[in-house]
């Protein structure tokens, strides 16, 4: 019987407009009304993850930054895992030596050295996903994040570690040269204290090895007294694999990578077609004998 459901956001719960469809919302509420906990598990920082959820009346716990931060439904922080100075130095040295652009995510915001480079990257990400990039909208969103303080511009990333209370949680790297970024990712992944994954082609998400979606989801299940065989995880990309491979019911989106589809028990429809909502309703009907 399913007792816990975890869903990724980008490419999974969210459509191309970064919205949670009505069907997805209704399916989540249906699960919650039947005593099932639904968790969002994302590579996004909390303030990025909460934005599309705030446009609905959903209330859920969050696994953020691939597990580097876990928040209760009330937004209280349950756990964090950050990168120490030596690990940050190892990561940034490898990226700089290979001329790979990156951003730094902390417990207080996202840091960039070059907002213009960010704009070009976000346009490229949209186009790689088969979307028509709305340059004006992307530029406005970047400026809005700078204005509200969630995207911070610095001359040099080295200054971040000098800020009292600032903890580096994730490094997000981008490069159009897929061979190069894969090679650097494999090299960094050889460190026993680093977890390296990806949320889209051409990026690397680097966290402490303790900060993985699967580890965070396992901790939540344990806290709730739920066996992992009674858990559903839904995702589309490499940073979802750590949770998909742990649960009894791994679900891949139809737009997922082949690696994700390979370990899934069930492949649902795409994120554009409310694949999350359809998967939830199908599984709860079959596994929990609920009338849907």
Regions found by a protein language model. Give the residues of each.
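Residue-level signal for inorganic ion chemistry
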Residues: 31, 42, 66, 171, ...
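Mg2+-dependent phosphoryl-transfer enzymes with acidic/Ser/Thr/Gly-rich catalytic loops
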Residues: 1-4, 15, 21, 189, ...
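Short active-site oxyanion
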Residues: 35-39, 59-60, 170, 229-230, ...
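Active-site phosphate-binding/coordination module
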Residues: 22-132
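Short, structured coil segments at secondary-structure junctions
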Residues: 56-58, 66, 98, 191-192, ...
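Residue-level detector of anion-binding/catalytic polar loops
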Residues: 37, 101, 195, 249-250, ...
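Conserved acidic, metal-coordinating active-site core of Asp-based
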Residues: 94, 108-231
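Active-site metal-binding loops of divalent metal-dependent hydrolases
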Residues: 9, 44, 235-237
């Amino acid at each position: 019987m399913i007792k816990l459901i975890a869903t990724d956001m980008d490419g999974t719960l969210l459509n191309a407009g970064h919205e949670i469809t009505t069907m997805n919302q209704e399916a989540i509420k249906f699960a919650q009304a039947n005593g099932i906990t639904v968790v969002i598990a994302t590579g996004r920082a909390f303030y990025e993850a909460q934005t599309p959820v705030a446009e609905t009346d959903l209330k859920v716990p969050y696994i953020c930054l691939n597990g580097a931060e876990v928040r209760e439904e009330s937004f209280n922080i349950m756990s964090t895992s950050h990168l120490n100075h030596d690990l940050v130095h190892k990561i940034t040295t490898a990226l700089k030596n290979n001329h790979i652009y990156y951003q730094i995510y902390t417990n207080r915001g996202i840091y960039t050295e070059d907002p213009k480079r960010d704009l070009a990257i976000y346009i490229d990400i949209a186009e790689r996903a088969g979307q028509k990039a709305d340059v004006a909208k992307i530029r406005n969103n970047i400026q809005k994040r700078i204005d509200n303080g969630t995207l911070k511009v610095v001359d040099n990333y080295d200054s971040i570690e000098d800020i009292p209370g600032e903890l580096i949680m994730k490094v997000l790297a981008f490069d159009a040269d897929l061979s190069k970024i894969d090679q650097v990712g494999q090299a960094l992944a050889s460190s026993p204290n680093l977890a390296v994954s990806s949320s889209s082609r051409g990026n690397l998400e680097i966290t402490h090895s303790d900060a993985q979606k699967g580890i965070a989801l396992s901790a939540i299940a344990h806290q709730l007294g739920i066996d992992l065989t009674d858990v559903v995880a839904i995702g589309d990309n490499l940073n979802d694999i750590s949770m998909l491979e742990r649960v009894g019911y791994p679900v891949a989106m139809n737009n997922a990578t082949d690696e994700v589809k390979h370990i899934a028990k069930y492949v649902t429809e795409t994120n554009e077609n409310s694949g999350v909502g359809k998967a939830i309703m199908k599984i709860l009907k079959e596994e929990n004998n609920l009338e849907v």
